[in-house]
Amino acid sequence: MTAEEFDFSSHSHRRYNPLTDSWILVSPHRAKRPWLGQQEAAYKPTAPLYDPKCYLCPGNKRATGNLNPRYESTYIFPNDYAAVRLDQPILPQNDSNEDNLKNRLLKVQSVRGNCFVICFSPNHNLTIPQMKQSDLVHIVNSWQALTDDLSREARENHKPFKYVQIFENKGTAMGCSNLHPHGQAWCLESIPSEVSQELKSFDKYKREHNTDLFADYVKLESREKSRVVVENESFIVVVPYWAIWPFETLVISKKKLASISQFNQMVKEDLASILKQLTIKYDNLFETSFPYSMGIHQAPLNATGDELSNSWFHMHFYPPLLRSATVRKFLVGFELLGEPQRDLTSEQAAEKLRNLDGQIHYLQRL
């Protein structure tokens, strides 16, 4: 087969992810195969405005006995079942007299920190695409305020906070244990592996090309258009060239902003707007409450000069659904043992999302 005959939309190929320094196998011809495997339960929008049994609804008692205030906007509280804690002893360093083989292979670090729950709305049955944009601005404001507060706690009170990972798991398909719209923030004294790898990649790219990786990538995607889903003055949303999940997207700041702490009011409103449009498109794709895991990647708290210089605010959305509201992608077999693989090309996925309404939610048309 000659190069002229190769078709990216039909033939297998590998794509490089410069953020993680890894490759993904793309097999577009597999999208036509029949599916007889597991199917997720289709989402039925039957949740009430208020659930007296919900641990996150205003005025309700949580499992620990703590009482929620009757909050009317976003509400943040320390996670009752935090993955990391402040009140634990520091692990001593390995004894240098121990077996060298053990020291080389069995490495361990103590990790302290704090975790928070971020209730997006007092309404039990509202997800991000169904909220008013003004409510989404409140969410963005809460992300910024939490980032600033944790940075100040580390700086002034010497709390062991180095990085805050803000994220949301939406839907039971993503392991969400409570359907009340909420996200989380885990603040650790170390930089998580995914973020650390990105920072290394950003640093390497800048040293080799004397510019920022995302500056070049935003320029490239704006020029090619084929992977762009939606954009506004401050942000561009793309299905990345190297996407693993079928309808994975990147929300990237068009200008270099290292952290949400640097956002002015206009940028915060633009982020709220782009998130609403993107998530409406997601829900409209299969006319379901589209599950995903999403999160912010930004500069570490009280970043060093190099960390600040290398960081560029962006958000990852990882939705599992593949071809319908009930058929999801699984990372198994070759993808666990070899490398990730996808069927639908990034360009095909972006076209589907781009052509969907990003203003009117499908439930408004019922």
Curated annotation (Swiss-Prot):
Cofactor dependency: Zn(2+)
Protein name (Swiss-Prot/TrEMBL): Galactose-1-phosphate uridylyltransferase
Catalytic activity: alpha-D-galactose 1-phosphate + UDP-alpha-D-glucose = alpha-D-glucose 1-phosphate + UDP-alpha-D-galactose
Record has Repeat as a keyword: no
Binding site for UDP-alpha-D-glucose: 63, 79-80, 169, 184, 329-332, 334-335
Source organism phylogeny: Eukaryota, Fungi, Dikarya, Ascomycota, Saccharomycotina
Entry's EC annotation: 2.7.7.12
Note on how the cofactor is bound: Binds 1 zinc ion per subunit. Zinc binding seems to play a structural role.
Catalytic residues (positions): 182
Domain of life of the native organism: Eukaryota
GO molecular function: UDP-glucose:hexose-1-phosphate uridylyltransferase activity; zinc ion binding
Residues at which Zn(2+) binds: 54, 57, 124, 180
GO cellular component assignments: cytoplasm
Gene source species: Saccharomyces cerevisiae (strain ATCC 204508 / S288c) (Baker's yeast)
CDD domains the record matches: GalT (cd00608)
Positions that bind Fe cation: 198, 297, 314, 316
Family label: Belongs to the galactose-1-phosphate uridylyltransferase type 1 family.
Annotated pathway: Carbohydrate metabolism; galactose metabolism
Keyword field: Carbohydrate metabolism, Galactose metabolism, Iron, Metal-binding, Nucleotidyltransferase, Phosphoprotein, Transferase, Zinc
Coiled coil segments of this chain: none
SUPFAM superfamilies, alphabetized: HIT-like (SSF54197)
Membrane-spanning residues: none
Subunit structure, as described in the record: Homodimer.
Pfam families from the UniProt entry: GalP_UDP_tr_C, GalP_UDP_transf
